[in-house]
Amino acid sequence: KKHTGETEYFYRSVVCMITGKSPHVILGQEMLKPRDGSGKDEGELTGGKRLIERLKKRHGHFADVIVADALYLNAPFINTLKENGLEGVIRLKDERRMIFQDAEHLFKQDEGKKASFWKGKKKIEVWDLSGFKMEGCPYKLRVVRYHEQWEENGKETERFMWLVTTLE
C-alpha cells in the first residue's frame, strides 16, 4: 500500500534481449512470482535462470553470450549459463569478493595480458587474467579489467571489472 492507503499493483520480470545494433529484439520475458504472506517475492536470479532454461528449450541456441549485472555473479547462475551452452560477461564490482581482491592483487603485480592505447584524449588500459575459480562452480573463469583516464577540469578516472566465463 502507498502512504495514502491506496493499494498499488505492479509486476516484476526478467527480460532477455538482443542489444547492440538495431533491431533490439526481446527474446523472452519471465515474470517473477510473488509470495503470499511475510516471505519475500521471488528474486531476479531465480527468474533469470528459469528464463535461460526456457529459451534454450524453446529456441535451442539463442545466444552466444549473456551480459549481466553484478547481482548475477554467483555459481548457480554461471553454472546455468554453461550447462545451457552459453558464455557470460558479468559485472564484478564488489570489492569484498575474494575473486575481486585476488584479481586486483595480481593486476598490481603486472600479471596477465595488458594492452594500452589512446582513443581521442582518453588513455585506455585493459588487463585480462585467466584461471580464477569460484566455490560451487567447476568452470575456470577470467577477469577482465578496463581502466579509462582523461583530463577535463582535473583528472578523471573510471574503472570496470568483469568476470568472463569463456577462456578465449
Residue ranges of predicted features:
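Conserved, well-structured functional cores that handle cations and Mg-NTP chemistry
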Residues: 1-90
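An anionic, glycine-rich sequence signature occurring as long contiguous blocks
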Residues: 87-168
